[in-house]
Amino acid sequence: MKVEAVVEVRYTEDKAKVLKALENVFTPKRVEERESDSGMLLVASCEGAGCLEKLRSAIWRQGIQDAARSVLSKGVVGEDTVVFSVNKQAAYVGVVSFVTEPGESPLGPITFTVKTNNVRQFLDWLAPRTYRGRVYYEAPPPD
C-alpha cells in the first residue's frame, strides 16, 4: 500500500502547525515542499499500513467507523485507489473530521490518496462495519 497526503500551507499559516496537523493523523516517511499559487504544498508519502495507524486510532477512538466507511467508500477511484480528505484544523487537535464538500475546510483539507491491491480489505481495516456500535469484523492490515 502506498499513501500520499497533500496539504496546503497558506501564506497566513505557520508551516510547523500545518505539519503538526498532518503528523497528528499520518506518519510520513518523506515530506517534500512544493510551491503553489497561495503558498506552499507539503506532500508527504509512505508505504505500508503503519503510516495510517494514527488516523485509524482516531477513527476508532471517536467511534466513527460507519461514517468514515461511508466517506471512504465514496472516494474509491478505480480498482486500486481511495481518495479522501480530512479537516486540517480538526487534525491539528487530534480529531478526524472528513471533508465531503469543496470549501468545507476554509484553510484547505489534508487530502489522502491511497493505492492498494485490495480496496475492500483497506476499508475493512481502517473503518470496519459495525453492528449496534460494535465492530463485527476486523480485517488485518492491507498490503
From Swiss-Prot:
Transmembrane segments: none annotated. It comes from the Archaea. PANTHER family: UPF0201 PROTEIN TK1335 (PTHR39652:SF1). Belongs to the UPF0201 family. This is UPF0201 protein Tneu_0685. It comes from Pyrobaculum neutrophilum (strain DSM 2338 / JCM 9278 / NBRC 100436 / V24Sta).
